[in-house]
């Protein structure tokens, strides 16, 4: 059986030396493969992300600091207040800690040093210790050479299921020069992932990114103005960044801060969506 391109890519990642030259080579090949074009110096969505990833900006100490899902809460507390943080129940530093720990019957369990990994525990269901053990053995840098993850310490954070829900809507707000510019809404992430995009006045936009455009309506949050203020305050410490929020219409909680959305390889549907999104984000100061 011939190995897949994905398998060959992972082998190449393991074999290439871990340095910035090879990191940038991987970024270039990944960008070329995803977008079928060379990266440019233009203010286009993925090109700006590519430049963040391939320059010293991705290693800015603050960007590295907020990549850790435990430490980002210290930043959020300092900038917008601890009331915007999801409460922390526990932080576990080893599998020994995990095996000794009595997990709450309902909780959210996730690694602080990875992305896209989460276990939602309900009604005291058994916790998958093998999956958590894999987290401790994983380094997200080795997946796609995002250098801000390279030296993060493996940990697991335990949080409550906020708003008593395991199917929250993610509001991802793209900020540029300290202002909220574009809103991405992720729905049914753990069922049938789909997305919608809105401007800051909650007008729906005619494109999606990576996932299908959601068909079901998404109501404007009652506290949208507060959400935009929180995102802008946090985003003011970066050039271009994504601030992820959860809300029940009253409270506004920060999920994470993302430096390089989609590793700069997610594609728009239709293709013209990238120019529209880019003009909304970068086209005005």
What does each model-identified segment do?
Residues 151-155, 195-254:
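A long amphipathic alpha-helix within ATP-dependent nucleotide-binding catalytic cores
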Residues 43-122, 138-147:
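A conserved helix-loop-beta module that forms one wall/lid of the active-site cleft
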Residues 92, 113, 162, 175-177, ...:
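Short, flexible loop/turn elements at secondary-structure junctions
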Residues 102, 175-176, 247:
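Generic beta-strand structural signal
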Residues 1-60:
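Membrane-proximal basic amphipathic "stem/tether" segments
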Residues 130-211:
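Phosphate-binding site of ATP-dependent enzymes
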């Amino acid at each position: 059986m011939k190995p897949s391109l994905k398998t060959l890519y992972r082998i190449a990642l393991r074999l290439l030396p871990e340095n910035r030259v090879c990191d940038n080579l991987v970024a270039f090949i990944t960008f070329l493969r995803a977008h079928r074009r060379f990266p440019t110096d233009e203010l286009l969505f993925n090109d700006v992300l590519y430049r963040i990833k391939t320059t010293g900006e991705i290693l800015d100490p603050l960007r590295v600091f907020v990549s850790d899902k435990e430490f980002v809460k210290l930043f959020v507390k300092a900038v917008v207040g601890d009331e915007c943080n999801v409460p922390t129940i526990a932080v576990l530093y080893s599998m020994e800690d995990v095996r000794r720990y009595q997990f709450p019957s309902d909780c959210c369990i996730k690694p602080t040093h990875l992305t896209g990994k989460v276990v939602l525990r309900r009604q005291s269901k058994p916790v998958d210790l093998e999956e958590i053990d894999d987290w401790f053995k994983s380094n997200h840098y080795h997946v796609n050479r995002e250098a801000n993850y390279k030296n993060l310490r493996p940990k697991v954070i335990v949080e409550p299921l906020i708003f008593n829900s395991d199917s929250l809507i993610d509001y991802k707000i793209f900020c540029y020069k300290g202002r909220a510019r574009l809103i991405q809404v992720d729905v049914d992430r753990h069922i049938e992932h789909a997305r919608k995009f809105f401007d800051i006045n909650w007008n729906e936009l005619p494109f999606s990114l990576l996932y299908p455009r959601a068909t079901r309506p998404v109501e404007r949050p009652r506290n949208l103005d507060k959400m935009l203020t929180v995102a802008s305050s946090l985003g003011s410490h970066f050039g271009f960044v994504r601030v992820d929020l959860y809300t029940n219409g009253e409270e506004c909680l920060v999920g994470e801060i993302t430096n390089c959305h989609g590793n700069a390889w997610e594609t728009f549907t239709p293709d013209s969506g990238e120019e529209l999104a880019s003009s909304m984000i970068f086209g005005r100061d």
